Curated annotation (Swiss-Prot):
Belongs to the universal ribosomal protein uL16 family. It comes from Pseudoalteromonas translucida (strain TAC 125). Residues 1-23 are annotated as: Disordered. Keywords: Ribonucleoprotein, Ribosomal protein, RNA-binding, rRNA-binding, tRNA-binding. One of its GO terms (biological process) is translation. This is Large ribosomal subunit protein uL16. SUPFAM superfamilies: Ribosomal protein L16p/L10e. Residues 1-17 have a biased composition (Basic residues).
Length: 137
């Protein structure tokens, strides 16, 4: 599972996920990409599940890039614990996703196969996505 090796602070504020993706909104490495059209949180488990689905579908040919990293800790208090007594312990890590962010990229496979693989990956994710291709200037 993806998570940072070390962080400056163990726990973070909740924050708000607003606006559009300013960075990572173009296909940079591969030929095809999976771009988020909705917003939400993508857990490390979801990132891995989508990666596995794509890798299995393309039968490990071509190359896949993961363009997101879960760098935000999400805390949780145990069941049946009263309020107060501090913030809960870190349960899992998420990547905050804004619309326009490219999540995965792929090259070395046909467009049809890439579309099918990205469709399988999109079913593992909690927001809407779209298939994009690299635009050559």
């Amino acid at each position: 599972m993806l998570q940072p090796k070390r962080t400056k602070f163990r726990k973070t504020h909740k924050g708000r996920n607003r606006g559009l993706a300013q960075n990572g909104n173009k296909v940079s490495f591969g030929t095809f990409g999976l771009k988020a059209t909705g917003r939400g949180r993508m857990t490390a488990r979801q990132i891995e599940a989508a990666r596995r689905a794509m890798t299995r579908h393309v039968k490990r040919q071509g190359k896949i890039w993961i363009r997101v990293f879960p760098d935000k800790p999400i805390t949780n208090k145990p069941l049946e614990v009263r309020m107060g007594k501090g913030k809960g312990s870190v349960e899992y890590w998420v990547a905050e996703i804004q619309p326009g962010k490219v999540l995965y990229e792929m090259e070395g496979v046909s467009e049809e196969l890439a579309r099918e693989a990205f469709d399988l990956a999109a079913r593992k994710l909690p927001f809407k996505t779209t298939f994009v291709t690299r635009t050559v200037m």
